[in-house]
Amino acid sequence: MTLIAKPSAGAAQPLQDSYQRFLQLGSRRAPQTLYVHEQGYRSSTINTDAQGMRYSHRAGKRFSVAECTGAGRINLLVGGSTALGVGASCDEHTVASKLSLLTGETWLSLAGCGLNATQELLLFLTHQHRFGQLGHVVVLSGLNTLAQEALVEILAATHDPQHSQAHLAFLNRFNEGVQDTAPARRASLWQQLRHAVAPRQAPQWPTLDALSPADKRLARAADSIGRSLRQWERLLADDHTSLTFILQPLLPWCRETLPAGEQSMLAGLAKQPTNFDRLLGDSYDRQLHSAFFRRIRSQAEPVPCYDMNCMLSSSPVFAEDLFVDRLHFNDQGNNALAKVITAKLGLAQEKHAQRRVPPVRQG
């Protein structure tokens, strides 16, 4: 499942070639984690450490999950590709780096493309031993968990071999919508012969019209997010760490009026929707969004939860081009996110300084 949209003419800020090369490297299966980004990746746009985690910057130094010794108290920005900073022109312009600049403290990116709420928690458990004193943990997330609810239904829909192959192809099209920046390789003679004699088949995609109603999937996703947040709360209860959940922004949930660059970007996406667009396409209704957040907040109690889709409009630059696709941001957008988060954390820390930790609910 891809989280990247194909750059289109007139987009607010097309995703850089480095992101496309980075994602075309794919993801490796590793024990206990579903996705692992390329380790030690180097480019002018995105760089990762020995664990595949992106670097953030503070005061001229870079820090990461694998390289945080001597950073003092650290803070974590947890989530998927938005928290990772896909769309930023360089590591210095991710949300984590902007939070470091605004707060004067080190913020690390504990994020990976495609991770759902449970996988985010598992990623923390995998690396928890690397962290010293934790100040704040901000989970900027929600949409991957929702998208995977549709994906689960697709995979469970049929056991017919032909349809199963289509479903497998759906999963394996990780790079759909990502332009290939590498030069095309000349096909071997055997490949040319096989292509010549093979029957012509149109690309198969699983049908999405048999999915359960969107409100049902949103409810299940909200319950999953709420359970995971209560587990986070229990894990961090003895560490005097502030935990906050922020529902990540989705363009249709954020805006009623689009700036020109984002209008052009959406026109391009309409011609070539990504897997992620297919999985979330029936969830863009604002009433569904409101019910989704309310249920997350109810299920996550007492973890403080906020909705960036509502808060982002408080930014002075909200009317400008911020999105590079429906869920990723350019540099100005990441800076706006960081400023809103900083302001909201100042309120949340005082209000939720003393929290009781309830037992994790079952079901």
Residue ranges and their predicted role:
Residues 1-75, 130-133, 352-363:
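N-terminal secretory targeting modules
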Residues 37, 296-307, 322-362:
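Histidine-centered active-site loop/cap adjacent to the catalytic His
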Residues 53-113, 117, 121-138, 334:
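Serine-esterase "nucleophile elbow" of acetyl-processing enzymes
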Residues 144-294:
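Serine-dependent acyl-ester chemistry module
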Residues 82-84, 113-117, 143-147, 250-253, ...:
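Solvent-exposed loop/turn segments at secondary-structure junctions
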Residues 84-86, 109-110, 218-222, 324:
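Second-shell loop/turn segments in exported
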Residues 117, 121, 222, 226, ...:
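Short, amphipathic alpha-helical "lid/cap" segments that border enzyme active or binding sites
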Residues 109-111, 247, 307-309:
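Residue-level recognition of beta-strand->loop/alpha-helix junctions
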